[in-house]
Amino acid sequence: MNPAHPFPAPAPTDIAIVGTPQRFPVHRIYCIGRNYEEHAREMNATVSLDAPVFFMKPADAIVTDDADVPYPSATTDLHHEIELVVALQSGGRDLDAATAQAAIFGYAVGLDLTRRDLQARAKAKALPWDTAKGFDASAPIGAI
């Protein structure tokens, strides 16, 4: 324990890397919503290539290594979507295509879990989706 902390800090989140005992450290999870046109229409959302919807999930929402994913509280409408996870080895901002490509460490398969009933209430009030998207165990992910 760090003596500067009044209690133990949580363990860092990391993901297995195929073919090595090393693990990939996770700092942030950025997500893009309404990026699949057919699914956006299915959800009665307007599809626009000009303005993607961004949201975040906390790193500790990740579930790895065949751990159980419990059914979350406060919902009766849990929805799942398969996702392509792009793991970046370096940060950046406003990157051109070549620099962005060079920042990619690898890829994984993920699952985006959403409490749709909570999301609908948030959308109706023009509120963020945090409670619908960023709950415990809402981001199962395979090895990179």
Ranges and model annotations:
Residues 1-144:
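Catalytic-core "active-site belt" of small-molecule-metabolizing enzymes
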